[in-house]
């Protein structure tokens, strides 16, 4: 899993912090244009820049990211020495998938405030998405030295290790995340992914069952469990579990989607076989049919 409700992927830790910094309790959307200033008054410019940043944070809270980006970009011009404003801009780029564009503002934010772990965690996210895993690991480990008890960052670090096939380090990082938050099912799920790639099918099954026990509404551990059970010869439970999983979210019937969620080669090979089973193919066919529109 990559980006789960908490980020199999990523938990964008910087954006919530930016929102809290600028305050979003009473959202009011003023005009975006910066008032004309006859004389450059530094205090006035700073006030305007922070106001724009606050508006940007408010818009981001309502997922209006493109509008938020415009304001954040203007804010960095008016208050170029404010690390929170740069962090906000970088986090917004991440939210809209402009991962390369996020690097420069996050680096600027980090140069202005080297003690804020959320900036480093966001940098780790950006580097991971760009497949720059060494840089991702460096940023995440530096952030964790400042805030070692952040399960989302430990999870992201585990993902980066996993992509480098540093399986022991990946499991250790996931386990630390679970020690801090024992119901953090994405980390438990990903321990299963690693164990499966190492050939420990029984261990993977145990992890996926544990993840399901925490949150039975999640598709990924259920489908992974179904695939593993099928490989072990437990056909009926495999089919029942797999059908139930796909009914929760049929995107998991797409191998490309599974690759995005960090499923490894061994599990993908078994999943390809599983998805070709007649009952599973029929289930997916039904789920992918257009739903009839209610009569007016």
Indicate where each model-derived feature is located.
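TPR/TPR-like (Sel1-like) alpha-helical repeat modules
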Residues: 209, 213, 219, 223-254, ...
């Amino acid at each position: 899993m990559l980006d789960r409700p908490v980020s199999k992927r990523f938990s964008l830790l910087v954006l919530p912090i930016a929102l809290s910094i600028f305050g979003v309790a009473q959202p009011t959307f003023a005009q975006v244009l910066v008032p004309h200033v006859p004389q450059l008054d530094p205090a006035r410019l700073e006030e305007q820049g922070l106001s724009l940043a606050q508006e940007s944070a408010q818009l981001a809270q309502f997922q209006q990211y493109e509008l938020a980006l415009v304001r954040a970009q203007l804010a960095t011009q008016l208050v170029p020495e404010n690390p929170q404003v740069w962090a906000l801009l970088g986090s917004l780029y991440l939210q809209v998938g402009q991962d390369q564009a996020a690097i420069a503002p996050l680096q600027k934010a980090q140069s202005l405030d080297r003690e804020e772990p959320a900036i480093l965690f966001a940098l780790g996210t950006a580097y991971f998405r760009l497949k720059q895993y060494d840089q991702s690991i460096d940023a995440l480990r530096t952030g964790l030295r400042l805030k070692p008890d952040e399960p989302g960052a430990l999870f992201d670090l585990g993902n980066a290790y996993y992509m480098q096939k540093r399986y022991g380090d990946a499991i250790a990082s996931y386990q630390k995340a679970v020690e801090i938050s024992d119901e953090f099912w994405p980390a438990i799920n990903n321990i299963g992914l690693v164990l499966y790639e190492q050939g420990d099918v029984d261990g993977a099954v145990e992890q996926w069952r544990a993840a399901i026990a925490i949150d039975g509404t999640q598709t990924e551990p259920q489908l992974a469990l179904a695939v593993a059970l099928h490989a072990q010869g437990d056909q009926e439970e495999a089919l029942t579990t797999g059908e139930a999983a796909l009914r929760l979210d049929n995107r998991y019937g797409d191998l490309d989607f599974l690759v995005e969620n960090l499923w490894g080669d061994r599990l993908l090979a078994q999943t390809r076989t599983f998805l070709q089973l007649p009952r599973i193919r029929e289930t997916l066919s039904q789920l992918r049919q257009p739903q009839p529109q209610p009569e007016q």
